[in-house]
Amino acid sequence: MSIRLPHSIDRSASKKQSHLSSPIASWLSSLSSLGDSTPERTSPSHHRQPSDTSETTAGLVQRCVIIQKDQHGFGFTVSGDRIVLVQSVRPGGAAMKAGVKEGDRIIKVNGTMVTNSSHLEVVKLIKSGAYAALTLLGSSPPSVGVSGLQQNPSVAGVLRVNPIIPPPPPPPPLPPPQHITGPKPLQDPEVQKHATQILWNMLRQEEEELQDILPPCGETSQRTCEGRLSVDSQEADSGLDSGTERFPSISESLMNRNSVLSDPGLDSPQTSPVILARVAQHHRRQGSDAALLPLNHQGIDQSPKPLIIGPEEDYDPGYFNNESDIIFQDLEKLKSHPAYLVVFLRYILSQADPGPLLFYLCSEVYQQTNPKDSRSLGKDIWNIFLEKNAPLRVKIPEMLQAEIDLRLRNNEDPRNVLCEAQEAVMLEIQEQINDYRSKRTLGLGSLYGENDLLGLDGDPLRERQMAEKQLAALGDILSKYEEDRSAPMDFAVNTFMSHAGIRLRESRSSCTAEKTQSAPDKDKWLPFFPKTKKQSSNSKKEKDALEDKKRNPILRYIGKPKSSSQSIKPGNVRNIIQHFENSHQYDVPEPGTQRLSTGSFPEDLLESDSSRSEIRLGRSGSLKGREEMKRSRKAENVPRPRSDVDMDAAAEAARLHQSASSSASSLSTRSLENPTPPFTPKMGRRSIESPNLGFCTDVILPHLLEDDLGQLSDLEPEPEVQNWQHTVGKDVVANLTQREIDRQEVINELFVTEASHLRTLRVLDLIFYQRMRKENLMPREELARLFPNLPELIEIHNSWCEAMKKLREEGPIIRDISDPMLARFDGPAREELQQVAAQFCSYQSVALELIRTKQRKESRFQLFMQEAESHPQCRRLQLRDLIVSEMQRLTKYPLLLENIIKHTEGGTSEHEKLCRARDQCREILKFVNEAVKQTENRHRLEGYQKRLDATALERASNPLAAEFKSLDLTTRKMIHEGPLTWRISKDKTLDLQVLLLEDLVVLLQRQEERLLLKCHSKTAVGSSDSKQTFSPVLKLNAVLIRSVATDKRAFFIICTSELGPPQIYELVALTSSDKNIWMELLEEAVQNATKHPGAAPIPIHPSPPGSQEPAYQGSTSSRVEINDSEVYHTEKEPKKLPEGPGPEQRVQDKQLIAQGEPVQEEDEEELRTLPRAPPSLDGENRGIRTRDPVLLALTGPLLMEGLADAALEDVENLRHLILWSLLPGHTVKTQAAGEPEDDLTPTPSVVSITSHPWDPGSPGQAPTISDSTRLARPEGSQPEGEDVAVSSLAHLPPRTRSSGVWDSPELDRNPAAEAASTEPAASYKVVRKVSLLPGGGVGAAKVAGSNAIPDSGQSESELSEVEGGAQATGNCFYVSMPAGPLDSSTEPTGTPPSPSQCHSLPAWPTEPQPYRGVRGGQCSSLVRRDVDVIFHTIEQLTIKLHRLKDMELAHRELLKSLGGESSGGTTPVGSFHTEAARWTDYSLSPPAKEALASDSQNGQEQGSCPEEGSDIALEDSATDTAVSPGP
């Protein structure tokens, strides 16, 4: 049976009927007797898309249903692979309500074809969310006898009525409709009764709305409508049939509408919005504002030929598609259509990078704005889009970016450059437009609100109004971004829309309860928007808020819930249906209520006037208990795409305030993956769910005590003083120079920012730390890592803020700021600040990672973080932003002080103090940075140790790796780490994670989550059977680092050890720069490990803190009083040369150090048994070699350079022991201050080693070289006629770098020590042999005590005669023992030399009075002691040279092996003569080179005897010395 509609209803307002699978369908079937038998006509033509049609093939119909999961799940089961069928359907379940039947074949799930998918894949797709969109193929459902209504599951429509307007031309007549029936309804009388009641209420509401619309109509029309709509109350009470019979148009409209909104099976969207949109546009409505008026506000069209669209009638989508296609073709057309642009912006913000489009739009506004107003906009465009760290940075050519930057800095107009930048991003924008067009062709345009554009018809007014409505949905999308991105996006959209003239209509006034609730929160919404400042009075706040609303169209939607329709979260089915069902309680609905479009639901679902926070429906499948269903939702729900509508938004606020036992899965999956706190506006919008969720302190922080709330009130942000001049009077500023004004500005900035930083620390304490501690949200250990010493840090900054306030109270002008700065950053205050700050900052990265983990795993902690970070005192900053404020503050201090120094007059005491304070700030920052780095490295080492697997190493037999079977990485300090590739052979490589520790290199192999310590082997060179095993752990004191000549990314680590043959590791970095970093750090670590082989040196007599030298007897001690402890004492060397101090400063330091405590004596046997590290030859340690010879116990494997260093040190110590009485400073009488002293050193070789141009006694320029009596000789110079071999050691550096490359000569003695000591000159005799006299003979000159030492009055010619002249080619000395003892007590009668004297005097200790010679046997004990020292040194030197010989032989074997293989395919076989020779030249010291050459000539000879090895190091002339050791 069919229903004939009256002629007053326009055909164009009708739509296809949705699927009726509820008790409503049962009730509708009873209406079959209401109409006459006039048949409706349908169009025979139909052109439907596959997803929209009902395909009938062999009795089967393809349809689409959308199922919403309820508390029992989806309510059906599936079976089969490839052909997946519905096996069973639960009666009354979600699937049955949606129209799923047993035996239906599933074609698509959520748009994905499943015809080739397995059973498990289909089930997984269906369970991927709370909604499932299924395309089914099955038998056609039974029909109901209602004509004009089509029950197609894929189509849901609502009959629309229009105001009375001139109708368009009628369409052609339609053929009779076909009748398609739906599934049988549920037989529930209560449900039918309830549905009938709802329809009656809707009918009354329609009458009232029509009466409101009728007055503007003509009198005749009004009488006609009243005649049709006058309903007798008695007739209404008698039953619905009579009312429906008299008013068929209204009843059918209600049937259409209620079939969608009241059907319990339609809690989820079961319709395709694309179909609704296109059907609605089949015949465009003329002259009606359909986009603004909801259904119940529109009148009835007086069209003379109303027709309803038949069930099989299709529509012509050409007009709308063509119009939209034209607009969506390029950006120029979009800019002129704001509504279409907002739809495109919704797509961009959901699916693409919004930066290029927003940059283009803002630049467009800039182009059309006058230069005065566009100046600030240009800076905003730079900060948002073009700066290096801009939140929405776009990629434009660097030249354009630099030009824009330059013009903005110079206050020039960058319009032309911005035009070019727009063209640069236009290509990417066009690609985004094409992407959107492709999605439109797939029917996805409705997801972004394109349905709302159907009735615009090119009307600019309606288009502008539609754009205003679309901005609401845009605001919801923006609210899901993080704050640092959402605020710039909001600003950019607001800028263009304001320029385009888009304004929002004033929303209707809310109810009293809403006003009362929203009033206290007004101020809390304002900080969400940029450049909104707090004002002092409430009137100003309200005025600014109103201005913001006018400027920012989005503010009306995201500010606070002004009206019920605006407070609805779009897309929430529960709210929409509940909203509609309770609408009858409002007697007079307002016609201006706006409709919000979600893009994924039919428009009519959203048309309502009010909202209620309760659910009172009790029908089958209703939303009763929906909150419990959502709370119990399991965590397997996968996150929906950002383009999808958030179905759970309205229930989110309730979930935020659940108990601690709520399931973690109830949280939004998106919030778990991206722990961004909700904004204040977003929290406010949720207040529609619970009236008590207003954004106030007692709700957000329910557990804070009253005193805490009082402290929070003290934390209100103070008004930021932008300009110091605004805080003082103009008369004060008028009397100051511009430089002083700038200085006061910087000082004021320091004060204000320090107070702001203190507020930030208090926020951390009150809102986070105190609550976490009171509520036991974190264990004490974790809390101690996150806030280790926060109260101490607050106290430090608070004390300084108080001091600054007192300083400010003294007057508006701060005259001298240096003393407070020094008081804060120097002395004990500096130590306290750097220690507390380092402790606070060290574990921040570890603690923040812990917080992220807890947020993912613990729902209670996640809720707390959301609440706390949403507090207004946090100023939209998250915990991770607040906790790093201390580190950021430390970096600001040097910059602020530098600016103050810049505006402070130089040369004043204040300037010097400020410079010192700045330097101390940098030291504090450096200290904290190092502490943070070490803590992070230690944390990473702990992680590596947990994953370390050394089982393979425990089973290995490699002796090198035996001691590392129980390796503990946490006991060492990590220097560097990173991935490297190990080329084991030509065809085998291995990816490694390499750790560089302070004494080890660890090669870790990744295997899943484990890190393996595993030995690897390869075939040895020259043998096909034997294999060489490589240890994964290398000691740094036994390795060499070399670069690979044929690969700029590779380097060698060569391990030399007594436990096995040399091993070569070829490691390849990712880039050449990485390789350089690795080599630099490795060489430095090798050098440090070589200085301290094995374990750290054990100091025999530890010096007091701060001392750099052993404590001496003071200025009264003489050289005769030297004891064993002084001879053998070693000290901890400095890491590097002190910067800045010259000779004078060094001498002063030594004089101060020399006043320390006496050094205790030790037995010589004990000294011989303890290992020694060679003292540094740098800086201050060079001058004590006569008193600090090194005893190195060769107990472990040593690097070759270490042996060479030690041997050379012994050579120097031996020379000084022999010749100490002849060195400068032991004169017969005291020299006058400032008088230059002649060089008394008898040999050129000694001069060349012990003097340098930068010594105090040598001014640095070359003296007259008429003979060899001068102390100073320029580096590298040599007397004429002198044999090079004689002084071969004279020009050798005392040590080498670990890389094997020899540096320029370094200081061999410490001038400061030389200037602070006293020395007798007659302890024993030294006989010099002159090998060649001027006449050609050989003679000898005996020097005995001080009588043979020439004084300063002797001429150079006399000295030349004694020493054999300048042509002497070599000298040799031997010791002649004195006959009697030497008096060891001399009393001082003078004062130490003045600093000026130190420049001219030699740096050796000087005697304050003339030496009084003593005869006899008084010096026998000293001589015997010195002889023992000499021979002990010679013995140690012999051992070291033997070891050096062995190292040289091992090195030669290593070079031979390198020549025999190509190093994993990178080093050619024939490259030994180049690379090996280069290594030989750079790695061997000159004495070792001579030994190597000698060994090469002798063939298989094992090496020279100890005497020969000693002679190599000691030989200074052509004649053997008398001090050469015996066997």
Curated annotation (Swiss-Prot):
Record field: compositional bias (Low complexity): 19-37, 656-672, 1312-1321
Described function: May play a role in the regulation of RhoA GTPase by guanine nucleotide-binding alpha-12 (GNA12) and alpha-13 (GNA13). Acts as guanine nucleotide exchange factor (GEF) for RhoA GTPase and may act as GTPase-activating protein (GAP) for GNA12 and GNA13. Involved in neurotrophin-induced neurite outgrowth.
Spans annotated as Disordered: 1-56, 216-247, 506-569, 582-687, 1090-1184, 1231-1321, 1379-1411, 1480-1527
Pfam families on file: PDZ, PH_16, RGS-like, RhoGEF
UniProt domain DH: residue ranges: 742-931
RGSL domain span: 323-503
Residues in PDZ domain copies: 64-143
Domain of life of the native organism: Eukaryota
Molecular-function GO term, any one: G protein-coupled receptor binding
Keywords: Coiled coil, Cytoplasm, GTPase activation, Guanine-nucleotide releasing factor, Membrane, Phosphoprotein, Ubl conjugation
Composition-biased stretches (Acidic residues): 1508-1518
Provenance organism: Rattus norvegicus (Rat)
Signal peptide from the UniProt entry: none
Bias (Polar residues): 509-519, 1242-1251, 1494-1503
List of residues that carry Phosphothreonine: T271, T676, T680, T1467, T1480
Full protein name: Rho guanine nucleotide exchange factor 11
Entries under SMART domains matching the protein: PDZ, PH, RGS, RhoGEF
One example of a Gene Ontology biological process annotation: positive regulation of DNA-templated transcription
Modified residues (Phosphoserine): 2, 30, 32, 51, 262, 268, 272, 288, 643, 671, 1299, 1304, 1462-1463, 1485
Intracellular or extracellular location(s): Cytoplasm; Membrane
